[in-house]
């Protein structure tokens, strides 16, 4: 079992190398339909599996097409990682879509609209209140 420092270093190295591959070496047209960025890489403790989280900007169709292209490019990415990194065994690579940015944007929109909703409720409560005379 690798130490957590080694796992962290391998993870950051994979992130850097895969980002470079996305920019320059993956020739699949489907990968280019949406703007893709690597947000995080999780490597298992035994360095045998790597989950690569990608954020894709574009329409839902472009996202689906890009993910299909990334899944088909996974063997190429693994082979390239094996040639570039000095590891005993190259980890199995899987691409997963990272939706945290979308969720964060949705939460920010809800929080920004919250003061307006509270102000509207306060006005409705003031209008429906009983007058004491």
From Swiss-Prot:
Major location category of this protein? cytoplasm
User: A single GO CC term, please?
Assistant: cytosol
What domain of life does the UniProt record list for this protein's source? Bacteria
What InterPro entries does UniProt report for this protein, alphabetically?
KH_dom-like_a/b, RbfA, RbfA_dom_sf, Ribosome-bd_factorA_CS
Where in the cell?
Cytoplasm
Write the record's keywords in alphabetical order, separated by commas. Answer: Cytoplasm, Ribosome biogenesis
One GO term (biological process): ribosome biogenesis
Pfam families (alphabetical): RBFA
GO terms (molecular function) for this protein are: ribosomal small subunit binding
SUPFAM superfamilies (alphabetical): Ribosome-binding factor A, RbfA
Sequence similarity: Belongs to the RbfA family.
Described by its record, this protein's role is as follows: One of several proteins that assist in the late maturation steps of the functional core of the 30S ribosomal subunit. Associates with free 30S ribosomal subunits (but not with 30S subunits that are part of 70S ribosomes or polysomes). Required for efficient processing of 16S rRNA. May interact with the 5'-terminal helix region of 16S rRNA.
- Assembly and partners? Monomer. Binds 30S ribosomal subunits, but not 50S ribosomal subunits or 70S ribosomes.
Name the record gives this protein:
Ribosome-binding factor A
Write the lineage as a comma-separated list.
Answer: Bacteria, Bacillati, Cyanobacteriota, Cyanophyceae, Synechococcales
Give the gene name.
Answer: rbfA
């Amino acid at each position: 079992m690798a130490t957590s420092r080694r796992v962290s270093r391998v993870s950051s190295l994979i992130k850097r190398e895969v980002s470079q591959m996305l920019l320059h070496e993956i020739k699949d047209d489907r990968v280019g339909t949406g703007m893709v960025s690597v947000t995080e890489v999780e490597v298992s403790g035994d360095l045998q599996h790597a989950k690569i989280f990608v954020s894709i900007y574009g329409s839902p169709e472009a996202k689906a097409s890009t993910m299909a292209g990334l899944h088909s490019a996974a063997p190429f990415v693994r082979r390239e990682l094996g040639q570039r990194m000095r590891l005993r065994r190259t980890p199995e690579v899987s691409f997963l879509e990272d939706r945290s940015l979308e969720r964060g944007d949705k939460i920010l929109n809800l929080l920004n609209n919250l003061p307006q909703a509270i102000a509207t409720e306060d006005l409705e409560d003031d209008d429906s209140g009983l007058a004491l005379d």
